[in-house]
Amino acid sequence: MHPVLQSVRNASVSAGGPHQQQPQQQQHGVSSVRRPPSPPRYPAQHAYPGAGATPTAGRGDFDGALDPDEGPVACGLAAGAGVDEVRMRERDAARRATVPEINLFKARRDVVPNGDYERDLMYHSGQAIDIDRQRVLTPEDFKGSEPAFTPAVNHMRAAELKRAAEQTAFGEELRNTCHQTRIRTALLRPEIGAGIYYLYDFVQTYLEHPDGRVKLNPQLVLVAQHAGNTMLAQRLWAIAEEKNAWLRDLIEMAYMIVNDPYLNTEQQLSAICTTVVELSMKYAKLAAKNGYPSMAQMAKAQEFFYRVMQAVLDLGVQVGVYNNRPARYRQKRMSEIPQMTDAEYMFGLTQALESRPPQGESFADEGPSESDDEDDFI
């Protein structure tokens, strides 16, 4: 219980508890003894005077009528004791006093109300601005004929624009690094080759044989189940439709890059990044109304194709596990081997004798030997 609530509770107990049943002689002249404050129940709780603890005769101890069902108070050192490190970092990141990070290319409209092309200008302006990072504003800097155009206001706006541009550049660099790390990790997995080969072959077979799709549907269900509840799984259900031709091309490019024997891991990563950039530029131009996409639109398109490529490679890894991890043979113990009865053994022996002829007859049934051939030749 919070210390403030505990003090209110103690005051209410002292006002309506055993004090009303005391003899009236104390009100006519008998001086009441001032009770010392009750000891704190927990280390984080302070002691408040007027507590409902009555001193015992001859001792300085106090019986505070503790409730065993109540847990420790959530204040002081006890506050946040059950919060793990991840939640503590989330709580610290969500503080109102922290300066929020702004990505000019991907921020929401309520954060950055400007358009895509205006965001490009803000980014380039922030990169070109050179401000004094050690400048300290003085009261004279806030003086001016126009309150919105003073040296202090101009410096603050320039600093905000510079910070937003630097945070945007850092965020995009971190995004590219994260995507490349995940793709490199998938390329280093030994199951990626077999998984991508199976995925590409299945898509081509499903596309070239429309009459046999009923028999291929169980495999499609298995592949889509490995994709999970994602956009890739929804696209795989309709992989044969013309609107998903871009996904078939992406799977084919991943198959060609992964199964190329002359490329190492870094070259494969470069080829995949080149494919992602080319696809993002192509479809970003088609999506833009004027045919010239902004940097914000390009960043969103690259983010989309990077995520799709990662999902395809992860799906190939999950499918390829079936070929690279067979069930290991475990030598059984003698006690685990089922023992045959005499009747079962004699039945098996009879079946073996009836199904296979004796060893001597097998040689007699064979064709003419080399000696017979030589006699005939002579």
UniProtKB/Swiss-Prot annotation:
It comes from Fowl adenovirus A serotype 1 (strain CELO / Phelps). Part of the genome packaging complex composed of packaging proteins 1, 2 and 3; this complex specifically binds to the packaging sequence on the left end of viral genomic DNA and performs packaging of the viral genome. Interacts with hexon-linking protein IIIa; this interaction is required to promote correct genome packaging. Keywords: Host nucleus, Late protein, Phosphoprotein, Viral genome packaging, Viral release from host cell. HAMAP family: ADV_PKG3. Residues 16-35, 49-58 have a biased composition (Low complexity). GO terms for cellular component: host cell nucleus. InterPro entries: ADV_PKG3 (IPR037536), L1-like (IPR004292). Cleaved at different sites by the viral protease during virion maturation. Residues 1-178 are annotated as: Interaction with packaging protein 1. The modification Phosphoserine is found at residue 362. This is Packaging protein 3. One of its GO terms (biological process) is viral release from host cell. All late proteins expressed from the major late promoter are produced by alternative splicing and alternative polyadenylation of the same gene giving rise to non-overlapping ORFs. A leader sequence is present in the N-terminus of all these mRNAs and is recognized by the viral shutoff protein to provide expression although conventional translation via ribosome scanning from the cap has been shut off in the host cell. It is found in: Host nucleus. Induction: Expressed in the early phase and late phase of the viral replicative cycle. Belongs to the adenoviridae packaging protein 3 family. Its main location: host cell. Involved in viral genome packaging through its interaction with packaging proteins 1 and 2. After proteolytic cleavage by adenovirus protease, L1 52/55k protein is removed from the capsid during viral maturation. Residues 1-73, 355-378 are annotated as: Disordered. It holds the Pfam family Adeno_52K. Residues 363-378 have a biased composition (Acidic residues).
